[in-house]
Amino acid sequence: GQVEGSELLNSQLTALSFSVDTNHIYITSGTQVIRNGNDTLRLDEEGNLVYHALAGESTRYRLPLRLSDQIEECRALAQATVGALCGDGRLYLQQIRLAGETLVVEFGYVLSGAQVQVGSEGYAAQFVLEAEQITQFTLRYRRYQAAPEQALVLPELQAAAALQALGRSGQELSLVYTDNGGERLTPAWYTAGKGGA
């Protein structure tokens, strides 16, 4: 489920290295906005928090030179924020990609050993790195509770048999939960690079 608004924002300012005393806070179209110097935080009603730094004008999230250290800094920030509040969920490194001079690092949620697909993008936290600093990030705050196995998903053996009947035997099955912002996650079996089974 979703994590609530202003209480969430207040609790996360310290973890995000924002001083409560020096912030200008206002609300626009249901989104809470905090400006601090050249940095902006926006928290929408769905529990999505977006940070933007004015390019080259912020020093809030400076990073070490080594790539592995940069990724570790992103992991630590994700763990201190969305990872600390996700209930029974856990974070994992989902993807690292290079887009020109920009590095994008994404972390996803996992619940009871299965990946959680959050919205259409899928990630729990995304960090954009440019010139040894984080210039933008998106944090999707969710709180998950593991439930006993339910009969809502086709048992693994039956899902494998269905794949074989479709001529796709030998492909690896993965259980994925879809989080569309509702109270419950939707489970489904997926094959690598394919749709649901």
Task: Kindly give the residue locations of the regions a language model identified.
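A short, surface-exposed interaction/processing loop segment used at functional sites
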Residues: G1, L54-T59, F127, E132-L154
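Short, non-transmembrane alpha-helical segments in secretory-pathway proteins
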Residues: E4-A15, R60-G100, A146-R184
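Aromatic/basic-lined ligand-recognition segments
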Residues: I96-A125, E130
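Short, solvent-exposed secondary-structure boundary motifs
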Residues: Y26-R35, V82-G87, G108-S120, A162-G170
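A short, surface-exposed beta-strand/turn
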Residues: L41-A55, Q117-L139, G196-A197
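Broad, structure-driven detector of short, well-ordered beta-strand segments within folded domains
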Residues: T31-R35, D39-E45, A125-L129, S169-N180
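Preferential activation on post-signal-peptide N-terminal prodomains/segments
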Residues: G1-S68, E72, L77-A80, A192-G196
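Activation/maturation switch segments at domain boundaries
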Residues: Y177-A197
